[in-house]
Amino acid sequence: MKTKSINILNLNVPCHCHCRYCLLEWNGKTIGIDYDRSINYAKSFYKWLKENKPELNFTYYFGYSMEHPKLFEAIKFMQETNSPGGEFLQFDGMKERTKDELFDFLAEIKNAGIKLIDLTFYGLEDYHDKFAGRLGDYNLLMNTLDVALSLGINVEVGIPVIKENLDQLNELVDLFSKKNVNLFLFTPHSIGRGKTLINSKITLDDYESMSKNVKNYFNRNTNRTQYEWLNNPPKEVSNRTLTISLLSTNIEDIENKTFEDVIKELEEMDYYFYSTVPSFNELLIKYADKNDKLLYSKKDLYAIYRKRYIQENKINIIDITDERYSGSIRY
């Protein structure tokens, strides 16, 4: 297993929604540290990497909302380090803005170098607002989309597909396919608050009932039944990204370690976790239910299998796959 990149994560950005499937289980409180302290640490780490491990990529990341207290400073740093956030921002959970305010803000975003924004729609207006936990969120996102396009900013729109919004997909796809956006449909995960959606997952029959137009935006290769994953398993992973999550509970300990020791500690955690918990392909052989017709992404199904394996074997282990905390991502 080869470490390919280092990800510095500081979840200090407030989100103004309370979505039903929030990966980060946002509850109104940020868990990161103040920006200046995080950026100073990230800058020092990046400088050390360039001098000592130039083969490793580097990313600075602050979560799924762009309401960063020092957004433009963060964008500049992300551009300096070739982090994705230097050109791409996720716009879910933003604070309310009028259309004029959105125009001014998005114009600033564009001038700062942002080329692409991402928006998530859960359904038509009433359903979307209930799912997002905020009245008016649908109209805010739609206004954001229209203003961004008028300014020449590229927009991608994702729609998580569950049983509850199946009857809304034709209208949604018809709406967004007429706009100049990159549209994609996907099955939501069962991680974080997403575990509450497990009974709402769509089946193969649900997929077959979709119109051809809707199917055009849904990637069946990445959303399969358990038997389909078993019958055509993915290649085994060989690379990993190490994530350093900066929290009030760990920042002093992290700052007191050398950068090399931080990397070594995370690699040891990674090795221990994956020598204890089998790979996705191994768990497929052990657990795949050939009669289950639900559709899963690999990320979702592997999370379900890992949880089952850990519980069945009564294993006490730190979950290094929890994307809120320090850990690793294998790919």
Residue locations for each model-derived region?
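N-terminal pre-triad scaffold of radical SAM enzymes
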Residues: 1-25, 50-62, 245-250
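Flexible mid-to-C-terminal extensions adjoining Fe-S/redox cofactors in radical SAM and related proteins
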Residues: 3, 25, 250-331
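Core AdoMet radical
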Residues: 6, 26-38, 52-68, 81-100, ...
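SEC14/CRAL-TRIO lipid-binding/transfer domains and related phosphoinositide-recognition modules
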Residues: 11-12, 36, 40, 44, ...
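Radical SAM enzyme [4Fe-4S]-AdoMet core and its adjacent flexible, acidic
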Residues: 31-33, 122, 130-142, 146-275, ...
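Residues at alpha-helix caps and immediate loop-helix transition turns in enzyme cores, especially N-
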Residues: 34, 70-73, 101-102, 168-172
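Short, acidic/polar
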Residues: 42, 98-108, 167-169
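Acidic (Asp/Glu)-rich catalytic clusters
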Residues: 46-51, 75-82, 104-114, 146-150, ...
